């Protein structure tokens, strides 16, 4: 059978013409079409490493938002960004000082994974809205605590699963939800795996780094040099579930969206994984996981052993009359039959929440107080799929999962993985 391909490049002009514009209401605009200084969104940025530095500029929209403060445990980073942004921006090493500062309406969090929930909670409790990088949390219990806080305080929250702002991926999900592929029975999700690492000898702590604060609630270990500030921490379970969550949350999030299950989860999970035998890294390098939903849909989640360019990366929805795939690294969709690519979703059909630019969407929701396309509950549910996959692989057996109670029924061994001890004095 033939298949079709639709890329972002092919539809750029049409997408721009059809896109709902990013709008700040005229009542809030000053005489020159910009928000008055008192109405601009005051922004604080926490975590200025590779990812944090790259996304910071997306939130600096002239006349809409204004940088107030930056924060990183590396003083050299905060000094560099303060110089770049201007003297009016304050630099901090401790996030608690930033979130307590008046004049900051929203924070962008791009710290290591084990800090996502604690910093988000501090910001929400201080009355700030939050954009938090993915994955949401290293444990299910931390993710649930964040959901509860966001609801209690009425915070606007957006998760960094930016593929929800890809129009083509939204279309792929709408094609599946509206049964243009017939009855959905299987979702195939694939993402690149990670790698093993050598043993890392202790290194002197650089004077510009607050290493104790970098560790936070994680176990205290000697400073490992490049392994920590070079991103290798993403493969160590003290800080995260590994690339199964760091990268895997993207296509799993799309799978949840297209299955109509992004506020719940599967009822069974089983899998096998390949873990390093020694060295600094201890999270899965490769995996094969199968999950089953209450609606009968099977989700098969695999890795490509760190092949970022594999055409298998993404989320493929298979139905009784065809399939459609959101191809992760090409930002395109594939379909069989190809006629699916010409699908127009009618006014009486299922339409998903629309966002065409993740950063602008967050700023607009901060002003309008509308729910984002990836709120805390949705972020938590997508991240949970990564976490229970890892638990099933580590235990090496099929597990039943209760998505309502968020526990493994009558399975004390598996439930022990749902939370972890926090190094004093840190707590949620």
Model-derived segments and spans:
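N-terminal secretory signal peptides and thylakoid transit peptides that target proteins
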Residues: 1-18
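N-terminal Rossmann-like dinucleotide-binding module
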Residues: 14-86, 163-166, 255
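Basic phosphate/pyrophosphate-binding loop/patch that engages nucleotide-derived ligands
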Residues: 148-155, 171-186, 203-205
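Beta-strand-loop-alpha-helix segment that lines the small-molecule cofactor/substrate pocket
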Residues: 117-165, 179
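C-terminal helix-rich "cap/oligomerization" subdomain common to oxidoreductases
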Residues: 13-37, 282, 365-428
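Rossmann-like dinucleotide-binding domain that binds NAD(P)(H)
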Residues: 212-295
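NAD(P)-dinucleotide binding in Rossmann-like oxidoreductases
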Residues: 287-356
């Amino acid at each position: 059978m033939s298949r079709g391909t639709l890329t972002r490049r092919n539809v750029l002009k049409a997408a721009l013409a059809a896109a709902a514009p990013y709008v700040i209401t005229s009542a809030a605009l000053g005489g020159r079409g910009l928000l008055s200084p008192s109405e601009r969104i005051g922004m604080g940025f926490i975590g200025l490493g590779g990812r944090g530095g790259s996304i910071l500029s997306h939130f600096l929209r002239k006349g809409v938002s204004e940088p107030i403060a930056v924060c990183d445990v590396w003083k050299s980073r905060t000094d560099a960004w303060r110089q770049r942004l201007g003297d009016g921006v304050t630099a901090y090493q401790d996030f608690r000082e930033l979130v307590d500062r008046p004049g900051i309406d929203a924070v962008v969090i791009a710290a290591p994974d084990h800090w996502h929930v604690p910093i988000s909670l501090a910001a929400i409790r201080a009355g700030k809205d939050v954009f938090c990088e993915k994955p949401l949390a290293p444990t299910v219990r931390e993710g649930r605590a964040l959901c509860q806080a966001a609801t209690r305080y009425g915070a606007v929250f957006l998760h960094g699963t930016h593929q929800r702002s890809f129009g083509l991926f939204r279309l792929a999900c709408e094609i599946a939800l509206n049964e243009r592929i017939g009855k959905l029975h299987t979702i195939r999700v694939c993402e690149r795996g990670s790698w093993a690492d050598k043993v890392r000898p202790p290194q002197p702590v650089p004077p510009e780094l607050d290493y104790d604060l970098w560790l936070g609630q994680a176990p205290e270990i000697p400073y490992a040099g490049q392994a920590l500030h070079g991103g290798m921490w993403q493969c160590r379970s003290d800080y995260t579930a590994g690339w199964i969550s760091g990268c895997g949350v993207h296509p799993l999030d799309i799978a949840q969206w297209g299955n109509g299950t992004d506020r719940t989860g599967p009822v069974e999970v089983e899998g096998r994984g390949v873990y390093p035998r020694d060295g600094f890294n201890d999270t899965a390098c490769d995996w094969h996981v199968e999950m089953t939903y209450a609606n009968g849909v099977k989700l098969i989640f695999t890795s490509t052993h760190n092949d970022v360019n594999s055409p298998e990366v993404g989320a493929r929805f298979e139905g009784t009359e065809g399939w459609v795939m959101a191809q992760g690294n090409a930002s395109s969709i594939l379909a069989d039959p190809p006629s699916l690519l010409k699908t127009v979703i009618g006014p009486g059909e299922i339409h998903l929440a629309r966002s065409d630019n993740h950063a602008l969407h967050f700023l607009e929701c901060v002003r309008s107080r509308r729910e984002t396309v990836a709120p805390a509950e949705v972020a938590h549910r997508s991240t949970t799929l990564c976490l229970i996959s890892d638990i099933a692989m580590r235990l090496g057996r099929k597990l039943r999962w209760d998505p309502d109670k968020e526990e493994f029924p009558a399975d004390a061994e598996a439930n022990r993985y749902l939370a972890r001890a926090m190094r004093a004095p840190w707590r949620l």
